[in-house]
Amino acid sequence: MGLWSIRRWTKPRTKSRYPTPLTAHQLWMVSLGAPVSRDRTASRTTLYPFTRIDDGSARSWLAEQWEITSRDRLAGRLDELSRSGYRARAHQLHGFSPLAWDAALYVDIARCGFGCGMITESEAWTALKNIVPSVVRTYASWQEYADHYLLGRKVWQDGLRGTSDASAPAPQAAADAHLRALLDPANRSSPWNLAPWDTISHPDRAR
């Protein structure tokens, strides 16, 4: 194990800073971002994006992947993803609008914004709540959400061809396998099994 890995695994656990479990609705909202990160350090059941406290990684990820280095840039990116995102180009080219791809990225970015202190916990929850109505209107199951996420990912990946970033994304097979694991009813750790699709349509409750 390298020095960087040792340092990460000696950081405090996220649940030591945020011990209160998410409510059913909160877990459902966080779970919209579950397709994005396949890393074992990613937290699936907290608003904080990692299983261990690592604000620096959240800040670096936003800067390197999204050129987000301030609250204003974060707000601008979230607004763009909520209004049009990648689905606008997908609709123009292919006639379909994969909202799930934009929604998953939106949630991931909002969580990292909270993780590095660009926005408060309250602001992060408000951001997540803002994306819920359009997602609920568009999809009726996690399966539908997953299918559209993968469609959106493919459109995004196709758009990278011929650019310097063409080799950056993980293989499509890796994304497919990750989504299958999230959808597997036998996977007890999947947040999609912990918070079924219709959770958000019922009164919120403690877990």
Please provide the spans of the model-predicted regions.
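Polar/charged low-complexity regulatory segments
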Residues: 2-207
